[in-house]
């Protein structure tokens, strides 16, 4: 049995866009190009609308297909694996301690961090709902841990907006590309909610899209944490050679990827 961490860009998304492209093209041909239905101005409007629609859908289909190949755990680039392993190496937990992975998805980061801390326990939490609920599930997490032979993990339901854990519950906290997907909430407040459950002296490694447009002034956020007594706080640009280069990050829509690491 092999682990199946799935893809951050599911095939169903690619197939859906491809299907939409075909439908738009057929509508373009039937309603516009052939003149079989419309004539004159209505035909011209149909040509423009469905022609542009076809091109837009074709672009996004190609882009999503490229993303799928890039993120594929079994593909050539394996960017997801690179990011997971690169983030997990910053997760350090004392023997007997417990770490938390917020928004664990299919369990990849939780399991990798557990492997690196065999005498500690990792907890993965997620709401496992929305657009990815058919792909990322609690059972998939548990199956992946079993396939990897990792026993020092457990998975539970938990929302990143209001984590179901008391203050200072964990010796380490981590997360990967979660907060930018949560609409309607201040991203710095989401980060603080995760850090709330971290013990004094605990470590954190949080990877996400942290551009000013998404997260505000992160340099000021770092200064705030230091002023509150955090022992160490650093921001690492992972789109500038660590996980990917600037050109690749721009093409993938991952510009602004940052790793927030430190010790409380």
Residue ranges of model-derived segments:
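A short glycine-rich, Lys/Arg-flanked "PGG" loop and its adjoining helix->strand segment in the class I
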Residues: 188-200
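Class I SAM-dependent methyltransferase Rossmann-like catalytic core
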Residues: 12-16, 61-85
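Core SAM-dependent methyltransferase catalytic element
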Residues: 228-229, 242-264
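Conserved beta-strand signature within the Rossmann-like core of class I S-adenosyl-L-methionine
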Residues: 201-208
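Helix-to-beta-strand junctions that scaffold the AdoMet/dcAdoMet cofactor pocket
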Residues: 117, 182-184, 198-200
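A short acidic, Gly/Pro-enriched loop at the edge of an enzyme's catalytic core
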Residues: 94, 161-173
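Conserved SAM-binding loop of SAM-dependent methyltransferases across substrates and taxa
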Residues: 106-118
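Conserved class I S-adenosyl-L-methionine
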Residues: 95-105, 123
